[in-house]
Amino acid sequence: MVRLAMAVKEPWVEYFFVGILQMRCSVVTDVTTGDTVIIDGGAEPQRIIDWVHSFSGKGPDWTNGPRSTEEMHESSIPTRTVVALLNTHAHFDHSGHIPDLKKAYDVDWYLHPDDTYLQTLAQKSALRYGFEVPEPAVADISLQAGKQ
């Protein structure tokens, strides 16, 4: 199990405003280990994957870290390894493309149990707004307040 409370002094944080609804996806990397968590990866999964792996394509809208492989190595940051997917809640724009990220990364997906039902409605909710998302994913681990 991954400890999601990444206790680092200077985490590398990137924000992506993704999808037609411009939802904010955060990518947080521990600069000492390269461990990376993707938060709310509900849209444009390929954009996120391409950037995390090779700094290719349209990068983040904001970052406090390197913007190329060369800058990453110059900063002595290890190669990134996605260790978990996490959602703040299960609106379709936040969780709709989690299945695509789960295919790309063999990692656990964390979601609060109160959002399980909402997640089952992701496709139906998306269609109401004219969007299509894959069949909803099922969380691997339930987030609980105060637990690590």
Where are these regions (language model features)?
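Intrinsically disordered, low-complexity boundary segments flanking structured domains
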Residues: 1-5, 127-130
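Short N-terminal helix-initiation segments at or just after the protein's N-terminus
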Residues: 2-7, 88-92
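Conserved beta-strand hairpin/beta-sheet module of binuclear metal-dependent hydrolase folds
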Residues: 3-62
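Active-site HxH/HxHxD metal-binding segment of metal-dependent hydrolases
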Residues: 44-47, 53-148
